[in-house]
């Protein structure tokens, strides 16, 4: 069972380009990179050469005579004589390149020759990407893949583009959803929250129709991520990174979700842990959301690098990291308890990141003024508040009405309720979060 992904359309466009460059697909482990590449390859190429540098490390020898296309193909033929290497017919796929980043140097020569399409893929690439970038600059194209977003989950459940179009139309016209729509889409979104977006987890749920086999898969994924930390880091750094990674659920369960290093180790200093935090971010395991120095445009350069929140890149990791009682309560009773705010906030951060939006929040010193996220349109800054209930939005009103915040004219509130608008505060259900970038783009037109 293949689950349709957004990378499918990108690969179609890449193949149709007359000036296509070798492609590097990066992203966290188990988000479906290899499956999507091979699904595309089987329907577009008569022959595929697939090399996995983890499963077959012997292929690291293919560069022993240099980086030219001729030498690489000759060495591949020596190691794999049955390989069909036919110009303009064979797709070359090099997987797990984090184990062999030197292969990226060959992309220049493959591009200049133009005989073969080449796709490279790997996880943990942030750790080696400066090296990969310097070795292939100007001769490759990049695509960053994430786990499934809510739209892809809806595709997996059998819905098509017409649903997305209808949802966006409701948002643009501020037309409330019917009760049937609210119940159905809300239930789907809650299922997605509990599952996360890892394809193998979603596939199991789609095939079985229940959650009974989901938790073991989520826990294994969490263990795999921790194993990567142990694999790629020496002892002391490994301990720091694991300590931070394991502290995220407790950090998010706090009323103030700002990352506090003292929750990781008593008496610890943030400066000693920043490399470990950046490692997790580069490895694609977490999203960092920086506090704005002041809520104004431009956003770039306006973030305080010493004040931030850490979210799991995929909310399924947050679910898997909770204690067993909390997990059972979540699935059996849909009781979000103390983690209600954490779950929804992590999910919205994930949705914004997957839509290509940067993550920023704001907390005014010595004040109750605080906003969860910000989105910029062409000419304005729009604060975004995630409400666990459907309560008041005092901070939103203050930001909109106070002339000191001149870039802010309206705000958005995400709630469990329906669509509405009052005092320039636009209210949308949580399940609309994946459409916010498209909605904001429409406001600017």
Predicted regions located by residue number:
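Conserved lysine of the Walker
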Residues: 33
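Hydrophobic positions on the alpha1 helix immediately C-terminal to the Walker A/P-loop
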Residues: 36, 40
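Short glycine-rich substrate-engagement loop in P-loop NTPases that contacts/grips substrate
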Residues: 55-88
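Structural recognition of the conserved hydrophobic beta-strand(s) that form the central parallel beta-sheet
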Residues: 93, 117-123, 144
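N-terminal pre-Walker A segment at the start of P-loop NTPase domains
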Residues: 1-16
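Interdomain motor-coupling "hinge/lid" segment immediately C-terminal to the ATP-binding subdomain
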Residues: 130-253
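Catalytic cores of nucleic-acid endonucleases
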Residues: 388-428
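Accessory nucleic acid-recognition modules appended to NTPase machines
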Residues: 203-370, 374-378
């Amino acid at each position: 069972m293949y689950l349709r992904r957004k990378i499918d359309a990108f690969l179609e466009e890449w193949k149709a380009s007359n000036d296509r460059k070798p492609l590097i697909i990066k992203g966290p482990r188990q988000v479906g990179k290899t499956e999507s590449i091979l699904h595309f390859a089987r329907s577009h190429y008569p022959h595929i050469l697939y090399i996995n540098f983890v499963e077959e490390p012997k292929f690291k020898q293919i560069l022993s005579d240099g980086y030219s296309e001729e030498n690489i193909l000759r060495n591949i033929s020596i190691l794999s004589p049955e390989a069909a290497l036919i110009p303009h017919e064979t797709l070359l796929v090099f997987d797990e390149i984090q184990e062999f980043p030197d292969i990226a140097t060959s992309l220049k020569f493959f591009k200049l020759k133009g005989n073969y399409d080449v796709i490279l893929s790997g996880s943990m690439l942030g750790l080696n990407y400066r090296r990969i970038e310097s070795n292939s600059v100007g001769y490759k194209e990049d695509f960053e893949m994430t786990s499934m977003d809510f739209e892809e989950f809806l595709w997996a459940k059998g819905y098509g583009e017409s649903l997305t179009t209808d949802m966006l139309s409701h948002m643009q016209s501020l037309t409330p959803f019917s009760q049937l729509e609210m119940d159905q889409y809300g239930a789907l979104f809650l299922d997605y929250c509990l599952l996360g977006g890892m394809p193998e987890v979603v596939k199991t749920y789609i095939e079985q129709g229940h959650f009974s086999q989901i938790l073991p898969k989520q826990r294994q994924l969490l263990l795999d991520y921790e194993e990567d930390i142990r694999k790629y880091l020496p002892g002391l750094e490994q301990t720091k990174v694991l300590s931070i990674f394991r502290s995220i659920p407790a950090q998010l369960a706090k009323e103030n979700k700002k990352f506090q290093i003292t929750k990781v180790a008593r008496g610890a200093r943030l400066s000693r842990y920043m490399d470990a935090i950046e490692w997790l971010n580069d490895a694609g395991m977490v999203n960092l959301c920086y506090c704005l120095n002041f809520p104004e445009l431009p956003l770039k350069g306006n973030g305080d690098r010493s004040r931030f929140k850490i979210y799991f890149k995929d909310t399924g990791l947050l679910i898997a990291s909770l204690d067993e009682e909390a997990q059972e309560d979540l699935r059996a009773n849909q009781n979000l308890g103390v983690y209600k705010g954490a779950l929804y906030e992590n999910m919205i951060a994930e949705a914004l990141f997957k839509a290509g939006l940067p993550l920023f929040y704001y907390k005014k010193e010595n004040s109750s003024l605080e906003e969860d996220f910000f989105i910029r349109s062409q000419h304005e800054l729009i604060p975004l508040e995630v409400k666990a209930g459907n309560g008041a939005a005092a901070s939103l009103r203050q930001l909109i009405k106070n002339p000191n915040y001149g870039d802010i004219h309206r705000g958005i509130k995400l709630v469990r309720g329906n669509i509405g608008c009052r005092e320039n505060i636009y209210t949308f259900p949580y399940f609309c979060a994946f459409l916010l970038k498209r909605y904001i783009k429409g406001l600017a037109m």
